[in-house]
From Swiss-Prot:
The gene is rpl37e. This is Large ribosomal subunit protein eL37. HAMAP family: Ribosomal_eL37. Binds 1 zinc ion per subunit. The lineage of its organism: Archaea, Methanobacteriati, Methanobacteriota, Thermococci, Thermococcales. Belongs to the eukaryotic ribosomal protein eL37 family. GO terms for cellular component: cytosolic large ribosomal subunit. Coiled coil: none annotated.
Length: 63
């Protein structure tokens, strides 16, 4: 089977991302087994970067 349009049509059967157990966002990748938002499944620590400020607003932190 090729890698073109026909195989891409099979991607609509199962969801790529489901709700994460840790952060609650719909960012847990089923195939890869980790959350794109908080890093659950890949790391014990929360995924956070200085260039990302949404998590600061969500948690009401001031640093």
């Amino acid at each position: 089977m090729g890698a073109g349009t026909a195989p891409k049509g099979k991607r609509n059967r199962t969801p790529t991302h489901i709700r994460c157990r840790r952060c609650g966002r719909r960012a847990f990748n089923v195939k890869k087994g980790y959350c794109a938002a908080c890093g659950f499944g890949r790391s014990r620590r929360m995924r956070k970067y200085s260039w990302s400020h949404k998590w600061k607003k969500k948690r009401n932190l001031s640093y």
